[in-house]
């Protein structure tokens, strides 16, 4: 459903939605919430494009018999809008995120060091070129060095990598098109030229030319399973002499995604990039439902690299003085 916005916030709300849609977010239920923001602005008789602390707190306050999930949804959307407004030069109070869910769980992702990554890629190459005694997997071992390199260089989910077809790859722009992935996010993934060359050589070697053909398949030409990749990855970790901490501790295949996000944020902070402006793009790139997941990685980045804590705190404190 298309909603009409009539308050003083209407132009910035429409601009915000254009930005989100342009990044591949469907933002359907969020449009309804933004309509409520617009209606609240009319009720409060706002005459300027600003989100005050009073306005925001009134918008997110809990009503009688209301479920927590509804409050969470309002907090999320008003935070997203406030961050966008700040990035566009408007004053907007950013309410602190709610302490709930996986973002505050005891789980700590495994983040690879640069040396561990070097060992893993060398071990993967060795695994691909060395036949096992029972010849298990040998006829298809050459796919795993490429899969692992794609995982780290793009931050994609393993399920997304295994669903890649020829039609999803653009060798001219060095990019993947991910459609209908988790959270219903369509997005374009830039790929490093070196990684793309590995992939192109593999595709040529395997004579994969049909647009509907999967890239990484088993002997039945079906996508290999995540379980298979996880099993092979444990073998590669063993070759690399990197211990596995056991169930729930890793490292796992998904650790490449965690590492990509943390390393990207680390590099941005070190280079002095505007984290506030870049955050929505990283969130869209990762396919996160909203910025809370990505914010968790920023906190983790600060914990792993204490020397950049001061720089990263600038992002968290942003908007604290913009509520008047």
Model-inferred region functions:
Residues 1-324:
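Conserved catalytic core of the tyrosine transesterase superfamily
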């Amino acid at each position: 459903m298309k909603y009409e916005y009539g308050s003083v916030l209407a132009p910035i709300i429409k601009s915000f939605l254009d930005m989100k849609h342009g990044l591949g977010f469907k933002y359907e239920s969020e449009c309804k919430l933004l309509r409520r923001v617009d209606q609240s602005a009319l009720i409060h008789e706002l005459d300027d494009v600003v989100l005050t602390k009073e306005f925001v707190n009134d918008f997110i306050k809990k009503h009688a018999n209301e479920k927590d999930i509804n409050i969470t949804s309002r907090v999320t959307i008003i935070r997203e809008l406030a961050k966008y407004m700040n990035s566009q030069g408007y004053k907007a109070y950013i309410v602190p995120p709610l302490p709930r869910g996986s973002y505050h769980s005891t789980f700590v992702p495994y983040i690879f060091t640069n040396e561990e990554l070097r060992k893993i890629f060398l071990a993967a190459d060795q695994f691909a070129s060395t036949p096992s005694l029972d010849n298990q997997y040998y006829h298809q071992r050459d796919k795993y060095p490429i899969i692992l390199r794609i995982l780290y260089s793009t931050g994609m989910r393993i399920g997304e990598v295994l669903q890649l077809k020829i039609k999803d790859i653009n060798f001219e722009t060095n990019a993947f098109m991910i459609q209908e992935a988790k959270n219903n996010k369509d997005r374009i993934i830039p790929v490093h030229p070196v990684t793309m060359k590995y992939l192109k050589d593999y595709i040529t070697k395997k004579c994969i030319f049909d647009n509907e053909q999967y890239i990484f398949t088993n002997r039945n030409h079906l996508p290999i399973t995540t379980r298979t990749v996880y099993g092979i990855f444990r073998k590669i970790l063993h070759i690399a002499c990197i211990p596995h901490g056991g169930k729930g501790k890793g490292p796992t295949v998904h650790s490449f995604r965690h590492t990509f996000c943390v390393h990207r944020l680390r590099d941005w902070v070190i280079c002095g990039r505007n984290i506030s402006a870049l955050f929505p793009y990283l969130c869209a790139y990762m396919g996160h439902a909203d910025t809370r997941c990505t914010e968790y990685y920023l906190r983790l980045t600060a914990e792993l690299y204490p020397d950049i804590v001061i720089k990263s705190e600038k992002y968290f404190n942003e908007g604290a003085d913009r509520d008047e």
